[in-house]
A protein has these predicted regions:
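Solenoidal tandem-repeat scaffolds enriched in leucines and small polar residues
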Residues: 133, 140-167
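Structural signature of tandem alpha-helical TPR/SEL1-like repeats
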Residues: 40-48, 73-85, 106-119, 140-153
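Short coil turns that delineate tetratricopeptide repeat
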Residues: 24, 57-58, 91, 125, ...
Length: 167
């Protein structure tokens, strides 16, 4: 059968290519099953699917989905490890640093939160959310003056920033 297939199609069977295609197919199945599970509220199954997908292929987008599920499942330690790995893979991705800062806030690690927010500001100076998170970190470290300075900067950048005004 393989002889006729290769004879009529003009291609020889390449087992390595088939293996790679199968691996890619399995990766996509796990990734999209995880996305469906996440939408249905099945965090445990979503974590399992995303973990299996990442075992097959390291993918930034899938890591982001897995970090979201960890946050939703109240597993900030796992989310933080994954987000720190993501910042090493793509160090110019502002939203990863913002998410990391939020996770650090959940853990009450204000120094790490400030560091993540400062990195986001270094990438994108005009990001009001980064200044707001830095202000929250300053507030957590009892640095009132810097807190006010960063919150003021956030309000200047985004005039209708209600959260910054309330803090």
């Amino acid at each position: 059968m393989g002889f006729f297939k290769s004879f009529f199609s003009g291609k020889a069977n390449n087992p390595e290519e088939e293996k790679q295609k199968n691996k890619q197919k399995n990766f996509e199945i796990f990734k999209y099953d995880g996305m469906r599970a996440q939408r249905m509220g099945r965090a445990d199954y979503a974590i399992k699917c995303f973990t299996e997908a990442l075992a097959l292929q390291e993918d930034f987008e899938t890591m982001g989905y897995l970090a979201q599920v960890y946050i939703q499942s109240n597993e900030p330690d796992e989310a933080r490890k994954l987000l720190e790995k993501m910042t090493q893979i793509e160090p110019e991705h502002t939203s990863t640093f913002l998410t990391l800062a939020n996770v650090c806030y959940m853990q009450e690690d204000y120094a790490a939160m400030a560091e993540a927010a400062q990195k986001a500001i270094a990438i994108e100076e005009g990001n009001a959310m980064a200044h707001y998170l830095l202000g929250k970190a300053d507030n957590g470290q009892n640095d009132g003056i810097m807190c006010i300075a960063h919150l003021t900067k956030a309000i200047v950048l985004k005039d209708d920033f209600t959260e910054a005004r309330l803090l």
